[in-house]
Amino acid sequence: MFRSTFFGLSRAIVQPATPLTVRAAFQSRFYSAAAAASQPTTTATTTTPLQQQQQQQPTTQPTTPIQTQTGAAPTESTKPVAKPYLVGRAWTQRLPVYHLAKRGGNKKLTQIKKVQGDGQALRRDLAQFLGLEVKEVRVKVPTGHLEVDGHRREEIVKFLDGLGF
């Protein structure tokens, strides 16, 4: 016996010691004890047509696996190349590349956050991709940020996506 609550009401539920068959449960509910004792109870189980069909079918598995092609196999050019740096993603699964405006809006910057590893290598690769001088890309080592002169978010995101970040 255990207690059950349903919408704040408490009630005791008695579970039978042995599981009852459907017929025995029906008899105990709708017939008196004397009438139930006079009728023989059977424990034969009934099967549905679906269960009979499943029992008749053989249970062998095919010997050859089915091979499906879901797309082109990755080639050497599409595999991401291992780099000495990593740019993590924000909690929204977007790349952490942001536009900044300083000095009253006169100085436009693009900031890359969550840079891990060799920031100088990322600085060189990014400057080469953007066609900038290396001095126009700055590494902020304590914070793990890179700053690029100008608003270049779309180009930087394209570069980072191309690397597989």
Curated annotation (Swiss-Prot):
Component of the mitochondrial ribosome (mitoribosome), a dedicated translation machinery responsible for the synthesis of mitochondrial genome-encoded proteins, including at least some of the essential transmembrane subunits of the mitochondrial respiratory chain. The mitoribosomes are attached to the mitochondrial inner membrane and translation products are cotranslationally integrated into the membrane. Component of the mitochondrial large ribosomal subunit (mt-LSU). Mature N.crassa 74S mitochondrial ribosomes consist of a small (37S) and a large (54S) subunit. The 37S small subunit contains a 16S ribosomal RNA (16S mt-rRNA) and 32 different proteins. The 54S large subunit contains a 23S rRNA (23S mt-rRNA) and 42 different proteins. Its main location: mitochondrion. InterPro entries: Ribosomal_mL49. This is Large ribosomal subunit protein mL49. It is found in: Mitochondrion. The lineage of its organism: Eukaryota, Fungi, Dikarya, Ascomycota, Pezizomycotina. It comes from Neurospora crassa (strain ATCC 24698 / 74-OR23-1A / CBS 708.71 / DSM 1257 / FGSC 987). GO terms for cellular component: mitochondrial large ribosomal subunit. It comes from the Eukaryota. Disulfide bonds: none annotated. Residues 42-81 are annotated as: Disordered. One of its GO terms (molecular function) is structural constituent of ribosome. Belongs to the mitochondrion-specific ribosomal protein mL49 family. It holds the Pfam family Img2.
